[in-house]
Design a protein with these regions (language model features):
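Low-complexity, proline/glycine-enriched hydrophobic segments characteristic of transmembrane helices
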Residues: 363-386, 585-588, 710-821
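Hydrophobic mid-bilayer segments of alpha-helices in multi-pass membrane transport proteins
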Residues: 18-22, 54-69, 84-93, 120-127, ...
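Core transmembrane alpha-helical segments of multi-pass membrane transporters/permeases
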Residues: 130, 134-135, 145-147, 154-160, ...
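Hydrophobic transmembrane alpha-helices that form the pore/transport pathway of multi-pass ion
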Residues: 216-284, 290-297, 303, 564-602, ...
Length: 821
């Protein structure tokens, strides 16, 4: 039994234990996400409700134990589990459960660990490192080890003065990282245990049900006959798989097995075929709602709601896929490629588009009726709303399954050889419409009912489990055969297998998020992000663009070899504060979600960046091409994705922040056109091969479309400088937006001046100085200067202005003031 990539084949007795642990872990996570604990507590009066911290401890106990049992430390142990691994699994789980068993005693001695606490913490960290090495290899282990070394040796004289900190004792560090919630058992692990697990489980169950194969078939039926059809199908299939997939590598393996051989067959080289799949699968990690399981972490770290995050991330992901689709088209045109032959004559175009529009409006009308019905039921009899939801789900599922029963099963086309001709989309579409019902349940709960991601994933998981259990038996029954209980038992086996697979997929993520807690804990303990910020500031020379480029390069380097969730945690912990801090000094004020998406995009692009690019290695194994050349080609395709973060840093409307739906549609059309022009410029081809000046012209036009304000700013500056004294003193009731620049001695080095820019809007009819004081900006005006006093704790700018030394010989002064033009 192959448990997962790089895992071991176990003997039968051990196999049952490992699979049993996986199943128990999944059932535990479903149990804690549901209302079952509260119902059972009410019925039987038992305290069987687990709080968030207890769930994290049990979650990591399962993850570490399974990492020891599934992944061999030596190649010789690939077919069995030695007794040493059983002991390691027991010790690892015990170190986590120690916190659960002795929680009352530990809380009573907060900050004063006993010897047992220190031993458990030390051994637990060692076991966590071993589990990480087994599950994910060296990259994240090396990164986290460097951070741990910095905690213990950050006060040593061999480090530059700017990097030194006071250091931590062994007792303090062990308590910080293991015994409280700022280290291993912190926010990252909490998000993994409460949200990510259920979404990974949902994806595993969808794949087990056959949805992945259905998406590939559907994309191929729609696009396979076009120029470069298999490559275009790979882009769409990877985008659809990205809805639920938590790994770009898994995406490459699942869709690339079918699409890469077909791309080679139509004329793509091995490297280009692999690169298209890599670029498409990498972009799948940027696609809402899951975003490689990092969406929940981004929402948690930025403080935006999960629904808002989906809205912010949707347009860049769509624009990026449109750009990739156009790149594939241009490659096919340049190479003179054709599509795959159709299996039968296509329907007339008018009939195709009429059917498409009818289907779209039919679904929209049905969704509207369901929404109105729910609203009416909730107002009249809210206790019946759940029964209405169940009725709607059953009706939709039965109807779509009835349609599927009139066509061959999805599994009849399950090999690359079966894709030699393109079947009509109207024959493929009905075969798997029932797979869309659980996805609709998930999205309905999140976007319409505004349930929490955890509860939404719970209902979506129940829906897909229902599909797996019943689809085969019901389809045969709808086809006129007798009801076959054997098919129901097969559905049960598939459901169990899917739940086990979901737990197996979570092992690496669970361990990675725990280790990422060490990095977050180091940053909170040492202020390491400030050190990196000073380094970036020194290297960039104060240039905003240079700073963003450096942060992008560092995010690429830090993201190499890491899974999506750990990737995001590492780059966001270190790089996001740098953009916020240095951007504020330069007058760039960007919403926090835009900053986190910036570093997330570049962290994900590391998957196809040589020399580590893991997704490129996975694709080259299928295409039989060179992995380095595949990675380089994939990165050239992904240049358009690398440009997007820079665009939405300077133009946050691309993230649909504070825009109407009409403006949102306009932004989408303009951004898509700009991305296609940029793709044509990078490919050197648009209708025909481009001359150098034509390439430059396309780049300028594309830039102008997404950043029109840049050229306007060159003619009419966005800010008008004002006389400091006159503005503050003679116009006390000025209404509008002010940009204030403060300069003063650095708190850490009084011989050096630092700068901070404040952007604030003065309400109409408000005294300027009074309003500034309410924000914590207390200014003192004398004959020549306007100085700033230290803000009071708790005011808006208290934390940001701690960079200044307010009690030195030189004051912190207001050196420039501008009003918005």
């Amino acid at each position: 039994m192959r448990i997962e990539h790089h895992s071991r084949l176990t003997q039968s007795a051990a196999r049952r234990v490992v699979l049993g642990l996986c199943l128990v872990w999944t059932l535990f996570q479903i149990y804690t996400a549901s209302a079952i604990p509260f119902v059972l507590s009410d019925w039987f009066g038992l305290n069987i409700v687990f709080n968030n911290q207890e769930v994290r401890q049990i979650h990591l106990a399962f993850a570490m134990a399974l990492a020891m049992l599934i992944h061999p430390l030596r190649a010789a142990d690939h077919s069995s589990i030695p007794w040493v691994d059983w002991i390691a699994a027991t010790i690892a789980a015990g170190c986590c459960l120690y916190l659960l068993v002795f929680k009352d005693q530990i809380s009573g001695r907060s900050g004063l660990p006993v010897t047992a606490d220190l031993w458990v913490s030390g051994i637990g960290l060692l076991m966590l490192g071993l589990a990480l090495f087994r599950a994910l290899g060296l990259p994240l282990l090396v990164v986290s080890s460097i951070f741990l070394l910095y905690v213990f040796f950050g006060d040593q004289p061999f480090l530059p003065d700017s990097m030194q900190w006071k250091g931590a004792s062994l007792n303090k560090a062990l308590w910080h990282f293991w015994m409280q919630t700022e280290g291993v058992f912190g926010v990252a692990l909490g998000v993994a245990s409460s949200m990510i697990f259920l979404f990974v489980l949902f994806g595993a169950l969808l794949e087990r049900a056959g949805a992945g194969l259905y998406f590939i078939q559907l994309a191929y039926s729609l696009l396979g006959h076009m120029r470069g059809g298999p490559a275009k199908a790979a882009v769409v299939a990877s985008g659809l798989s990205g809805i639920y997939s938590g790994s770009s590598i898994a995406n490459v393996v699942s869709t690339g097995t079918f699409t890469i051989p077909l791309m080679k067959q139509t004329g793509f080289t091995a490297e280009k075929a692999g690169a298209v799949e890599v670029a498409a699968s990498t972009n799948g990690q940027l696609t809402p709602p899951v975003m490689g399981a990092a969406a929940f972490l981004i929402a948690e770290f930025t403080g935006v709601s999960y629904t808002d995050l989906i809205r912010h991330a949707l347009l860049p992901a769509l624009v990026s896929y449109i750009g990739l689709m156009y790149i594939v088209h241009l490659e096919a045109v340049k190479l003179g490629l054709q599509g795959m032959p159709r299996s039968s004559r296509a329907l007339p175009w008018l009939q195709r588009y009429t059917s498409l529009l009818a289907g779209f409006f039919g679904v929209a009308l049905l969704g509207g009726l369901i929404h109105l019905s729910f609203g009416w039921i909730k107002g009249v009899a809210p206790e019946f709303s759940i029964w209405l939801g169940l009725l709607v789900f059953v009706a939709l599922y039965v109807f779509t399954l009835l349609l599927a029963s009139r066509h061959p099963d999805v599994e009849t086309l399950d090999s690359p050889e079966s894709f030699q001709t393109v079947m009509p989309a109207h024959e493929i579409l009905p075969r798997g419409l029932h797979f869309l019902v659980p996805i609709a349940v998930l999205l309905w709960c999140i976007l319409i009912e505004r349930l929490s991601p955890t509860l939404s994933a719970f209902w979506g998981t129940l829906a897909i489990l229902t599909v797996i259990l019943t689809q085969s038996a019901l389809k045969q029954w709808f086809r006129g055969h007798a009801f076959q209980w054997a098919l129901l038992r097969r559905g049960w086996d598939q459901a169990i297998s899917g739940m086990i697979q979901g737990a197996q997929n979570m092992v690496g993520i669970g361990v990675a998020t725990a280790v990422a807690g060490i990095i977050i804990g180091t940053v909170s303990l040492t202020g390491a992000h400030q050190v990196i910020g000073e380094l970036v500031e020194a290297l960039s020379g104060g240039s905003l663009i240079a700073m963003l480029v450096l942060v992008a390069l560092m995010s690429l380097i830090l993201g190499m070899g890491l899974p999506t969730t750990a990737n995001y945690i590492v780059v966001s912990s270190l790089m996001a504060p740098v953009i916020v801090s240095l951007g504020a000094q330069s007058g760039l004020f960007v919403p926090l979600v835009a900053v986190h998406l910036f570093v997330f995009y570049f962290g994900i692009l590391a998957d196809d960046t040589p020399p580590v690019g893991l997704a490129a290695f996975a694709a080259s194994a299928i295409s039989q091409g060179d992995p380095i050349r595949t990675g380089i080609q994939g990165f050239t395709y992904d240049i358009r994705t690398a440009i997007l973060p820079f665009l939405f840093i300077f133009n946050t409307e691309l993230l649909l922040i504070d825009v109407t739906w009409v403006k949102g549609v306009t932004i989408f059309v303009v951004a898509a056109a700009a991305m296609m022009l940029f793709a044509a410029a990078t490919q050197g081809f648009w209708l025909t091969r481009l001359r150098l000046w034509e390439t430059g012209a396309l780049l300028v036009i594309a830039f102008t479309l997404v950043r029109p304000g840049y050229w306007i700013d060159q003619i009419q500056p966005p800010w008008l400088p004002q006389s400091i004294n006159e503005t503050v003193l003679t116009e006390p009731t000025y209404a509008g937006t002010l940009q204030l620049v403060f300069e003063g001695p650095d708190f850490d080095d009084i011989d050096r001046d630092v700068r901070y820019v404040v952007l604030t809007t003065i309400p109409e009819g408000t005294d300027v100085t009074t309003f500034l004081e309410s924000q914590g900006l207390i200014v003192q005006v004398d004959a020549e200067t306007v100085s700033l006093e230290e803000p009071f704790p708790g005011t808006n700018y208290f934390q940001d202005l701690q960079r200044f030394d307010f009690y030195g010989d030189r004051p912190v002064a207001l050196t420039a003031l501008s009003v918005r033009n």
